[in-house]
Design a protein with these regions (language model features):
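Catalytic core of pol beta-like nucleotidyltransferases
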Residues: 1-8, 16-22, 31-112
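Short, well-ordered beta-strand segments
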Residues: 27-29
């Protein structure tokens, strides 16, 4: 990822939270300055899944900003800005996201 220009990377998912099983993949998230590649364009070993943070949905990016573990950081001011901004928006929007999830689950339960 570094060779492709990622400024920082975070471990997330089950390996970051300590709930990994032996067959769990490795979930990594990275941020690029400028034009970010698609996740499939970055050459990674088998078993490593990449989230490109530049375009990640808020629910996913927010969980990564809150629970991710830093793997490397070539641009600390950029990382701090991304984490702070993403966490703020995530926590501000969390009540709306939870309400939407409840309404969706209720609609499924009612068969609509």
């Amino acid at each position: 990822m570094r060779l492709s220009g990622a400024r920082f990377a975070l471990l997330h998912g089950s390996r970051a939270t300590g709930r990994a099983r032996p067959d769990s993949d490795i979930d990594v998230a990275a941020w690029w300055s400028g034009l970010a590649p698609a996740s499939f364009e970055v050459d990674l070993p088998a078993g490593v899944d990449l989230v490109v943070l530049n375009g990640a949905p808020l629910e996913l990016a927010g969980r990564i900003a809150v629970h991710g573990q830093l793997l490397y950081d070539d641009d600390p001011p950029c990382r701090v800005r991304w984490v702070a901004t993403t966490r703020k928006i995530y926590f501000d929007e969390q009540p709306r996201m939870l309400r939407a999830q409840r309404e969706f689950a209720e609609a499924l339960r009612r068969g609509r």
